[in-house]
Amino acid sequence: MKIIKSLILLVLFMASPAKGDDFAWMSSGLSGLKSIFGCLEVPTFTSFQEGKIGISLSTAGDWQSTGNAVEKGKLLKIKWSTAGLTPEPRKYLVLYRIDPRFSVPQVFIKTYNYKNSQFEVAGFPGFSTANDGVIPPDKNLDALSFTKMNNYVNYFNYANGNPKIQVNVGDIVNISLADKDDFFNPSTSKTPSTLNNILAKELDSSVFAASALYTESNLGNFENRIVYSSAEQVCNIIDAQRATLCTGTGSATKYTNVSNGALVGKPMAVTTLQNFMSMINSCPANSNLNANPSCYYDQGRGMVIKIGGQVIKNRDQSFVNNDNTQNGFMYYQATSGGAMDFSSDWQPTGMFNNSFSMSDWSRNFSNYTDFATYITNGNWATNFLYFGRYAMIVEIGNGTNTISPGDQKNITLEYLITADGTLPSSSTPGTTVGYDFSGDAPQDGYLWLRVKNPNSNIQGTISVDYANYTGTTWFSNIVYNGAIKPITDQFRTYSEDFYFKLVANSAIQNIAKTALTLYVTIFGLMFVLGALKLTAVEVVTRIFKITIVAILLRPESWSFFNNNFFSAFINGIDFFATNVVGATSSKSNIFGFIDPIFDKYTNGRIWGLLFIQLLQIHNGLAFIVIITIYSLITYFRAVLEVIIGYVIAFIGLTVMISLAPFFIILMLFEKTKTMFNNWISILFSYVVQPTILLIFFLLIDQILSEQLLKVIVRACWDTLIPIKIGLDLSNLGIPLNFSFTLPFLPGIPFFVPQVPDITSSNILTNDTNTFLVLFTTALLFYSYCLMSYGLVSFVTIVVGMLTQVTPARIEGNYQAPSNPTESIMKDIGSVAAPIKKAALAPARIFKDKVIDQNYEARKPQGGGEHTGKFFQNRNDVKPEQTERND
């Protein structure tokens, strides 16, 4: 009775409680109580708290909250993927500039850093000082640059590792002219961390220095132009009388550069050059040096672009004009891969009468004084003018839209657990995890995640799935930490101690030495007599056997064999068991998988609903519940078998390892080698058996979880037992027969299972919990539980067939394989028999005194009465009459 009261209280506690300040339920009728208690829904198994978060690479380095609270020592799983990432177009800022001191056009390249949102430059052959950004007072720009001339030449010839823009097959290349009048404008950062401040001053200096680098061409508002014209045509426009800027006439005309700016690609002052550019027009197609009148080239003309040596734009080809930005562009899909090259077939050769090549200067002048004298005294009048520049934005997109393996490898995910929910600083270190991480939480707290991405050209969102165990761990802690681990640790120690005693035993030592001597002697005699064919494999095999037995005799043999051989079996059991388990409470506890199972099958809501169904004796639900409960008890016994099977396998493994010295010696001779092979097979069988047993067990558990939820049905507050008072006086000759219900107590209220009646619409479907579906599901649940209970015997046979190890047999029953687990379970059953009988005693009394007792009832016809027992004779009919009827 106490048990029944406890179950009723449990069910009532699971119902929706009334509010503390609402006393309306006290005056409610039975129908009103239904809205208060509501319904008990079938629970879902949620031993894990799961979540999903998308982390944008734009927030890389910042911690993101998951909202999950984790517990120390319990499982934490994190699984993430880079499937949602795509590469940003590789973006470059390219400055193509004509400088007659170089045999090829100057090409400055900046790479766009998406993380910093700016173009950044690296690799320029600048110079540094003790105070970067400040030119020393005893030095001038020309003197500082003089020592770097050879580096400049190598830089533009790509001889010092200066990388070109790389293009892969299938890449989409988009080149557009940029509205930039300065290679170092504010949006591209003049002082990136990879470049000295002084370099920016060097490239932008307005001071003439023949040895310095420049990015300006003094084009002013006329950017993205190239001028390639004879001195005669230029002078005819700016100095037709040859009064100040020019000398000579006809083909002998020379442009006299007073400031020597033409030598560095700046032939005129800004105002003069802008005035000149305003007086000339764009060159017609196929113009050349002697175009008359002088003109300029625009829209990319005068420049040749190649990819991997293949020309994608020739010199006279124009970019397509963009009506929106008025800047030209070109679009190309690469059919071949390689480096992108910007060049021209126009050469500055013959522009000056003196030597103007920086490569010649770096070879011919060993000191700055001689060089400065040469520049000062030289005649730098030009025979033609060739100057100008193009600023371009180059974007290269991946045709397959996938990130490279290298970029993918650089992206990492970290997790952090904090004691409170305060946002951690970005400088707080985290723990890096792989794509499928599984481990125990190092502490209690809240889970945070962040992405670290050193690749600035990758965009998108990383999808992260995470889960942590929230159920109890008491069972696995008791079973593993309290019982199994002490046993396995002791047997590890016993195995090592017994091994040492065997190896140190003089008798074993003598046997091993004698066996080695006989083996070598017999081998030598057979070889001398020609009875043995020696092959390389045979020689290696025999040397290997001798070496192994020789190591066995050494004091450090345990360390050698344990580290290289035994540990594979000892650790193999735990390794395979841990890796085949999916849901577990703890990664460090190999029996953690039992905790989610016990959380499922000991759920209070489940047992409360089972008790509610148990009260439904009149419609047969009680029979279904009895089958379910008995099935669960059978399943719990199967869990115990799995645990015992693991312990026995581990003990058997340690015992076999402790006997290793005997069996290792036996591998020398063919007659005894079979015993050694059988020993190896037994070791494998002890490793494989728990693994296969777990796999089968967990598969069945998945099915059982689904079936159990189908056996249990939703229960709502209703009338459990209707109370109807009836009066029938017809037997007394009074024609009075009526019945009525009490208005204040129409029945005994309680939770009632919601089982629909079988109809023509649901008789052939199993999506509704009709009585037919519940009964068949209960039988299936019972069948699966019986299947799990017989797993140990089945797996023993399977492992025996795999490893060729014959299972041990019971004495007197040599045709039936047995296993120690079955014997242990029988012993446990015999010990628990008295407890089982005592527990069933109340049930027997209930059956004898209540179910089987005589009871009176009105005979359906004729008014007779009868009493009887179930499956017994009727008491209202005499035995003689029964025999006569038969």
From Swiss-Prot:
Residues 875-886 have a biased composition (Basic and acidic residues). It comes from the Bacteria. The chain crosses the membrane at residues 520-540, 609-629, 647-667, 680-700, 779-799. GO terms for cellular component: plasma membrane. InterPro entries: Conjugal_tfr_TrbL/VirB6 (IPR007688). It is a multi-pass membrane protein. Belongs to the TrbL/VirB6 family. This is Uncharacterized protein RBE_1262.
